[in-house]
UniProtKB/Swiss-Prot annotation:
Residues 46-146, 153-253, 260-360, 367-467, 472-572, 577-677, 713-813, 818-920, 923-1023 form the SRCR domain. It is found in: Cell membrane. GO terms for cellular component: external side of plasma membrane; extracellular region. SUPFAM superfamilies: SRCR-like. The SRCR domain 3 mediates calcium-sensitive interaction with hemoglobin/haptoglobin complexes. A motif (Internalization signal) lies at residues 1085-1088. Its main location: membrane. Keywords: Acute phase, Cell membrane, Disulfide bond, Glycoprotein, Inflammatory response, Membrane, Phosphoprotein, Repeat, Secreted, Signal, Transmembrane, Transmembrane helix. This is Scavenger receptor cysteine-rich type 1 protein M130. The keyword Nucleus does not apply. Residues 41-1039 are extracellular. The record marks 263-264, 275-276, 327-328, 354-355 as: Cleavage. A soluble form (sCD163) is produced by proteolytic shedding which can be induced by lipopolysaccharide, phorbol ester and Fc region of immunoglobulin gamma. This cleavage is dependent on protein kinase C and tyrosine kinases and can be blocked by protease inhibitors. The shedding is inhibited by the tissue inhibitor of metalloproteinase TIMP3, and thus probably induced by membrane-bound metalloproteinases ADAMs.
Amino acid sequence: MVLHDNSGSAGFKRCSVHFGPFTLAVVSVLYACLITSALGGTDKELRLVAGQTKCSGRVEVKVQEEWGTVCNTGWDLAAVSVVCKQLGCPSVIKATGWTNSSAGTGRIWMDHVSCRGNESALWDCKHEGWGKHNCTHQQDVGVTCSDGSDLEMRLMNGGNRCSGRIEIKFQGQWGTVCDDNFNLDHASVVCKQLGCGSAVSFSGSANFGEGSGPIWFDDLVCHGNESALWNCRHEGWGKHNCDHAEDAGVICLEGADLSLRLVDGVTKCSGRLEVRFQGEWGTVCDDGWDSDDAAVACQQLGCPTAITAVGRVNASEGTGHIWLDSVSCQGHESAVWQCRHHEWGKHYCNHNEDAGVTCSDGSDLELRLKGGGSRCAGTVEVEIQKLIGKVCDRSWGLKEADVVCKQLGCGSALRTSYQVYSKIQATNTWLFLNNCNGNETSIWDCKNWQWGGLSCEHYHEAKVTCSAHREPRLVGGDIPCSGRVEVKHGDTWGTICDSDFSLESASVLCRELECGSVVSILGGAHFGEGNGQIWAEEFQCEGNESHLSLCPVAPRLDGTCSHSKDIGVVCSRYTEVRLVGGNTPCEGRVEVKILGTWGPLCNSHWDMEDAHVLCQQLKCGVAASIPGRAPFGKGSGQPWRHMFHCTGTEQHMGDCPVTALGASLCPEGQVASVICSGNRSQTLYPCNSSSSDPESSVVLEENGVPCIGSGQLRLVNGGGRCAGRIEVYHEGSWGTICDDSWDLDDAHVVCRQLGCGVAINATGSAHFGEGSGPIWLDEVNCNGKEPRISQCRSHGWGRQNCRHKEDAGVICSEFMSLRLISDSSSETCAGRLEVFYNGAWGSVGKSDMSATTVGVVCRQLGCTDKGSIRPAPSDKVENRYMWVDNVRCPKGPETLWQCPSSPWKRRLASPSEETWITCADKIRLQEGTTNCSGRVEVWHGGSWGTVCDDSWDLNDAQVVCRQLGCGLALEAGKEAAFGQGTGPIWLNEVKCKGNESSLWDCPARSWGHSDCGHKEDASVKCSEIAESKGSVKAAGHSSTVALGILGVILLAFLIATLLWIQRRRQRQRLAVSSRGENSVHEIQYREMNSCLKADDLDLYNSSGLWVLRGSIALGFRLVTAAEAERHST
């Protein structure tokens, strides 16, 4: 076999050694290439020899394994700088011909070296070529560098460590720096080196006093980015033509005692600019003072928007120093004194040229569009510090308009225009946007905008229509704030499909049109069919936006839509409330204006909390009482049936959640009333409780003196405000009522007093649990017509012979409850949705039922925050009573009762109309070593509990693992394998088949029915184990180690492969010798153009032969003898 050598492969060492045996050749070549690729280093080195420190000596270079010297022809400080940096001794002390020490021997590798100073290695500099020179070793160069450990710097006579005369310690002696050519770049290096921040100023002429000793530096050349002053270019240590009268000094930011303030302005962000320097305040001259300078000053003062740069015309005159003159900022500086300026205190000004600024912190800046039909179209109007102005169209273009639209969150500009005003109307304050590039996020970020009493030629006001411009209206309604929804986009009005408009979107629409809250949304062209455009977009409002144009939109997903599906909305303003029929403005019948019509409010849900908010809104103090029997008259028209859910802390009725109970009639004469404390809010007294007669607490009210406290009622433990154990407030504490003689007439009075309709059931024997504290009333005997329980006959306050096991309760007609009915006893968070109202259970219709509404139901039931609607079981065929349909909850309500719906009316409905819900499961694994192992715990009835291991097997475990997304079940653990839990044992005798989607689908005993202890808690181990708790990922190895490991693996694999090939070839030769030489071609090996990089190797098997392949030209391959013969010829 022959190994052919071909050189010329870029980036590789030449492989020229010939090998005989095939296997040894391949292994050697691969190993050499892998090692070369892994090391990838240079064969040149640099050192200093015969010096007194590691950073000084004769310069020697190692080339081709041989050390040699460098000739001093052309040798300068730039070359010395390269050597010092390369050796990690970046400070140049001096360059020298190394004649004061022994000369070098052997090669002189470099001559005529010419460096720029920024090279990373000496051999990167230009030179004659390796070994080319006309020198002797008497011309060998040397250097003296420093790593900085033997150099020090300090500032003297400045009063602190960050200001003063510059002094440097070199070779054990302190010396100064000459001020020749010293500037702010030099000062910046000094301040940075000393950790004193940026340079504020520099000085010469021994401003901080004359030093003594050597003058170490003169004519320094710094760029400002050097890490130390001695790294700047210089003539050499101690070389100068100065005396100490020229000693340089600096003042750094950390030692400058600098401050900035505004004086004599009308706001905290305006006024004359003053700077404190060296303990004294002074002004800034307005020479060259412009908007860039003002922008830096405003930013520094925490008022980031510069409105005007005030000069001599407007700024008041200061006194004392004029510290700065000819300030010239770029706009990006963090402080005014970082801008270019004359030396501190040098100026050519008087105080009538003092500079000032008018800035803003953003709180007094506003941008808006007016008169365009929506917030995203119209005339551009700005308000700056309470002064309103327009934008002049003289410099108005699409770029400026784009910035306006962007700032308002209205997309991009579709078109610009202008509004022409007469000269009489043109006394506006104008804003000129002179130089927006379109990329700004705010018009205040545009450069060189001008504001104030400027003249706008032709009196044109800029206008814009933005891409998000959507102007809504309601059309076809009988009253204002109701009708078909139409939206104007661009110049075109169009309708919205009823599948593309949610309750949240309707809420935003009502708010934008100043129509209060949404009452209902009606599909099917309820307000008549529109014509023309139907917008093919779905509004995706969250509900808290102020305008429809702020809501995201998405393309419609359900195909085409016709005008027969135009959406309509009915809004209502609950915020207009009044009291009518009383002797004072602070008492009377409660009337609410809804849909433009005033009407009395039904008192079936009116309570003291609602009354408190109403009195507060009307500035009538607090609610003293809510009398029944319509003492202020019934009013005209049918009372509104809306229910307010005030907590008593709101400032306005419009802040309270509202339930619209639809069109069912209010009981005759049940009109809400209130007596507020009015001007006597500070003189309210508790009702007289000294008498044993409950009637005494009412006498004050009937005599016209409002009282609070005794006789207040509440219902406890009933699941709602209109059912529960009765508790009455007296003498500062709550107590119960005994059930002796307790009947439906007594219960009627309680329900009426609480605004809960009529009594359905009068309960006794502590039906709603035993109370605590006093038992205030016994033998209550009402005739059913009293307005308050305290007006009924009884034994008197506190006179009783009862115990709390006799506490009375009530269920009123307005009590509402919620449940899910399922055939499975283990399912409490899934089933048919039912509500309890007016004493009877009924189902809820599924029309318009959304995921948000389902979430409210699940949360109200204490299940989870999410759920889904499921089909009704096919075996359910009987009709049942339904209470309500079209329930559509927005985001926010805590109960179903706060969601708009169709009117509440009991009717028969088929199972296909009913709502069936499954609330999202809550299951977890505890105490496991991973997220997919541990004790099984389930959430039920508001608490976590465990599962008993009776009948627990791998099928049950499989369902749990699947439910948690943890793959296959590996083990069904028993006997508290992961420790004993606490709390309830919710499930027992679980018997899954293994294919169920959740544990709740498996047969089991009823919830909480168990004969187990926690020592029998069930557990699981699943296959898809999540990252172990507390695990830490190991840090990655270095690339060199990784490459080395890769090389070893490849090499081992290659050796094994090639040994196999060799054995196979030997067997083939034996076969050839037995059948004749011409049966098989001889195999030869030849090298191609280059060795391979280790990361270019790719081994694959093709037609039974192993071939090495890379991303470059193949390094070698297997060829037949015939191919080798053609190659050799």
